[in-house]
């Protein structure tokens, strides 16, 4: 279109996209035009700073504390997908207190099913799951919530929030049964509204009113509200699936900060993401899934895109297992 003499206006928060296509770039923040610059005179880091209003540090932030005991132990787990195919095959992993474990892998290699199992949404055929010293026998969402597992799902509006309801109702989903939120089966309306307002303020959720349907919020504010609910429940383990998908630079930085704060407070974080930059930036340990198994493990300091990519493609780990099986046979 440009070569035909037409003018193209591209609106996006994806920095790689704008750097690959635009001739001039204008940055908007909070409804105002902040800056306009030729693409040849800028870079992604400067654009990120203009979008957020401050410097965005992309380097990995290591934990300042020693990791604690194993909080989650998964051994020889076998899970079938909806259509009957084996989604997890003899999967084993551990997540310790005070660490972020990032799981990388091409979509469709069992990440979805793993997250569902850990949140009580899917049952398993074989294997064991030990959480906080107790073996989990059957899948139950309520049991996993009460045990201390928080969940940020891949699709926040499909599985995490009720779009037609406001902040108050969405924040109550996990805690409405507790004595703080209800009494004799009736919600503590006044107290719950005050509590909701405090969480909206604490997590910097931008909304006209706590009763405004969350579907009218931006994606970043929806995600902050979801994190507010999950973190307020004081979880031991956070299972975060593609937590920054569709978010702009500022909202992404905010989500990353929340995850690292959980880790630094001694909580465990299991991060499932297809964004390798995100996995590399946040993870203390990196695991790679392929064909329903963990085929690679490395520390956050040792991990690099090339090695992870080879594992994701099945070029490492998987062939070694096949060779070992052939020798044993």
Protein language model features and the residues they cover:
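Glycine-rich phosphate-binding loops of nucleotide-dependent enzymes
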Residues: 1-329
């Amino acid at each position: 279109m440009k070569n035909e003499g037409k003018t193209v206006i591209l609106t996006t928060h994806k920095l790689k996209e704008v750097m690959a296509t635009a001739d001039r770039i204008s940055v908007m923040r909070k409804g105002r035009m902040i800056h306009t610059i030729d693409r040849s005179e800028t870079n992604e880091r400067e654009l990120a700073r203009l979008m957020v209003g401050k410097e965005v540090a992309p380097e990995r932030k290591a934990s300042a504390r020693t990791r604690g005991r194993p909080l989650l132990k998964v051994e020889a787990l076998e899970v079938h997908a909806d259509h009957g195919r084996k989604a997890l095959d003899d999967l084993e992993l551990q997540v310790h207190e005070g660490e972020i474990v990032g799981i990388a892998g091409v979509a469709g290699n069992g990440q979805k099913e793993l997250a569902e199992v850990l949140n009580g949404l899917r049952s398993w055929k074989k294997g064991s799951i030990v959480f906080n010293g107790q073996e989990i026998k059957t899948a139950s969402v309520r049991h996993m919530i009460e045990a201390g597992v928080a969940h940020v799902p891949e699709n926040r509006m499909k599985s995490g929030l009720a779009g037609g309801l406001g902040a108050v109702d969405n924040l109550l989903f996990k805690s409405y049964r507790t004595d703080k939120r209800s009494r004799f089966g009736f919600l503590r309306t006044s107290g719950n509204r005050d509590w909701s307002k405090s969480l909206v303020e604490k997590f910097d959720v931008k909304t006209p009113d706590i009763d405004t349907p969350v579907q009218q919020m931006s994606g970043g504010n929806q995600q902050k509200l979801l994190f507010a609910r999950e973190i307020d429940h004081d979880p031991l383990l956070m299972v975060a699936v593609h937590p920054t998908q569709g978010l702009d630079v500022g909202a992404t930085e905010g989500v990353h900060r929340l995850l690292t704060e959980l880790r630094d407070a001694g909580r465990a974080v299991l991060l499932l993401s297809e964004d390798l930059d995100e996995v590399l930036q946040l993870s203390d340990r990196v695991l790679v899934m392929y064909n329903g198994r963990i085929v690679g493990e490395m520390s956050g300091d040792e991990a690099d895109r090339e090695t992870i990519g080879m594992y994701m493609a099945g070029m490492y780990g998987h062939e070694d297992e096949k060779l070992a099986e052939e020798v044993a046979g």
